[in-house]
Amino acid sequence: MMPFSREERQFVYTWLSNMLGHELSASQLAQYQQGLFDDFFAFLTEQGFQAQVEGIQQQLQQLKTVELAHLELAADYTQLFLLDGSSSALPYASVYLPEAQLTCHFTFLEALLVRFQLQLNRDKPEPSDHLCVYLELLRQLAEVDDMKTYRQLIQDALLPWLLPFNDKVQRVKTRTTFYQQVVVLLILLLQADCQN
């Protein structure tokens, strides 16, 4: 993998946040199926993520044969991320990190939120340890080109809980594996980007 530019990092993390922050609408799904993201998928393939891109594209292709496919994907999203902790893979660090690590973890996270003057959307009460908060912090760190903190966030604050989160994601039974493929891509991108 070639090192990402600042703009590429920002785009990738915005895309991942959009993919994992809420279910795709019918119009968003149609955009993927019509090929509007083919250039982005080609970029990811060139970066060495061919298997993951093919998996995502295969799921999108299969959904073309499903009536009301966006509702099927919404059901998968709900099953994966929104039910209780025994049924779903909740996208929160506090679910996967040991209790002893939480204070230090949240102190680091809160310092970054303050640094970038990020406030959580009070209309939708989300805890600060939601996966999309981390993705936004990565985007912000890429924007200011603070690669030391960027790598620290990935290695010390994100991957330690993202790996067990992915284990749970892969065990949840859904009709498609679309979101499972996206989570694997996220982890591989983080691991590869941290090594460059």
UniProtKB/Swiss-Prot annotation:
GO BP terms in the entry: protein complex oligomerization; protein folding
Cross-referenced InterPro entries: Chaperone_TorD, DMSO/NO3_reduct_chaperone, HscB_C_sf, TorD-like_sf, TorD/DmsD_chaperones
Subcellular locations according to the entry: Cytoplasm
Annotated Gene Ontology cellular component terms: cytoplasm
Keyword vocabulary terms for this entry: Chaperone, Cytoplasm
Primary localisation category: cytoplasm
Recorded family membership: Belongs to the TorD/DmsD family. TorD subfamily.
Designated name of the protein: Chaperone protein TorD
Species the sequence originates in: Pasteurella multocida (strain Pm70)
